[in-house]
Amino acid sequence: SMPLINSKGVRQTPWSEGQNVRHLEPMGFIKFDLLGLSTLAMMETAIELILKRHFRNDNPTFSDVKSFYDRYLHPDKIDLNDEKVYENVFHKGNFVGTFQFTEDGARNFAERVKPNNIIDVSAITSIYRPGPLSANVHEDYIEAKGSPQYIKYLTPEIQEITEETFGFLIFQEQIAKIAHALGKDLSLDEGNLLRKLLTKKGTGKGFEVKDRIHKKFIDGCIEKGIAQTEAQALWEKFEYFSGYGFNKSHAVCYSVISYQCAWLLTYYQAEWIAAFLDKEPESRKEEAINTAKSLGYSIAPVDVNTSGRTWEITKDGKTLIQPLTSIKGFGESAMIQVLEHRPFKDIEDLLFREEVKYAKLNKKVLDRLCRAGALDALVDDRFTGRKHFWSAAVVERPKTKKKFHENIEKYRGEGDFSEEEIIHFKTELTGIFPMNLVISPETIEKLKEKFIPPISEFDEELQICWFIPRKVIPKKTKRGKDYWILQVIDSNNETEKITCWGIDPKKDSIHINRPYMSRLEYDPKWGFSTRSMYRNFRLLG
C-alpha cells in the first residue's frame, strides 16, 4: 500500500527524493492520467437542456444529469452500432461540436471512410495524425475498407488480429498480439514489452531484450511456414509502424466520447447546438453561430426580459435565444439583479425599481445592455431612435424620473444609431453578425438573377461571387512580399478564407463588414485566392 499524508488540506503521497511516476509500475502501482475535457461540460449542459425541455425538470441537479447519462449515454448502455447516428453525423459530415472532429481534415476523412462501428471511428482518429498522414496511410485505408475482398493476409493469425482494421497495423496492441501469435514461445507480456521497446532507440539493456524477442519472433514465423524474408519484412513493418502507432484502449475510449456527442447531435440536435454555442470560446463564437444558422436555426437577439444565463431554446425548437452572458462585461452580480427582478415593462421600470441594487446594475452595465440591443424592446414611441434612448437613459444616467423626462426632450434630435454603429456594437459586444444590415435580401436576389452566387456556392467556371470581409490578416512571404488572408462570410452563414497576393499596403484597402463582388481562383488544396485586389474586387452598394 502507498501511505497518504495531509499537507495543507490536500491528500498527498510522500515520495522519496529522486522518485517519479516512472517508479510506480515496478513498485506494483497503476498510474492514472486524469484529463479534463471541455466536451464533458458541453454534454452536461446539453443534458440539462434536454431534461428541461423533454422531461419537465426546470431545475435539474447533477444527480439528474448523471441519471440521464447512466440510462442513455453510459458506454454499457448506449447502442454503439446505431446506423442513424453514423449516417447522420459521420457519413454526412454533420460534426457540430463532435469531439475529435473539429478540423476539416478529420471531418473529410471520416466522410470518405463512412465508419459503421466504434472501431472504425477509433481507426479514423488514430490515422488522422501527422505520422500516418505523411505515410499516406489514410488513402490506403480508405481503399482497403472500400474493397475488403481484395485484402491479402500473410497468415490466418494476422487476419484475425487486423481484419477489424482492414489489414492495417493501426493500434499498438496489434503488435503485441501478432508477436505472441507468431513468435516462438513468445508470451503476451513479451509482446507488450516489444510494443514499448519499439518506440525507444538505443543500444542498452532494452536493445538487448528487443534483439532477443526479434530472434524468437523470426524463429516462430519460420516454424509456422513463413519465409524468413517475409518474417523480417513483417518485423520491419512493426518498427515502421512504431513511429505512428496508437494505443487502442486510449483511441476507443476517446471515440466513445465522440460517439456520445454524435448521439446527442442526432437525437437532441437543438439542445446539443445550444450547448455547443454556450461552450465555444469567444474566438470561435461567430463561426459557431453561423453553423447554427446554416442548420436552420434562428438566433433570437439578446433581450433583458427573455435571455438567461445560457443559450435557451424556444418551445418550437427552431430558435436559439442568446444569453445575457454573451454580452462582454456583463457579470454575475448584474445577472442576478436582472433575473430576480424582471420582467421590466418599460425603461422606467428598469431604471427606478426600488428593490434593484443599482450599484450592481450600474451605468456601465446599462450601457452594454443598450448598445448590444438587449434593451430594444423597451424603446417606445417617446424616442426618435435607439441613440436617443441611449443618450437619455444611459449616457446621462438619470437619478429621478423628472430628470429622465428632461433628458428625453434634451436628446430628442439624436435619432437612431447608424448602421455602421449597430454592426460594430453587435459584433463587438455579442459576437453576432447582423447580416441583414450589411446586405439586403433584395440585393442578394438581384445578384442571384445575374448569376453571381455567394462564395459558398462558388462556380469554378463563372469564377465570380460575392462575400463580406470580416477580418484582414496581414502576412508576408518568405521573400518579404506582403499578402493578406481575408476571413469572409456570406448569406449562407458560411465562412471562407481568401488569399490576396501582391498586396500594396499603401494602395490596397478593404472595407470590413461591407459586401464585395470579386473574381477569384479556387484550388481544392489551397482554397480561394486572387492575384490582384485592385482589378478583381468591387464594393457593392
For the regions a protein language model found, what residue spans apply to each?
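Noncatalytic, beta-rich nucleic-acid-contacting surfaces in large DNA/RNA-processing enzymes
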Residues: 1-541
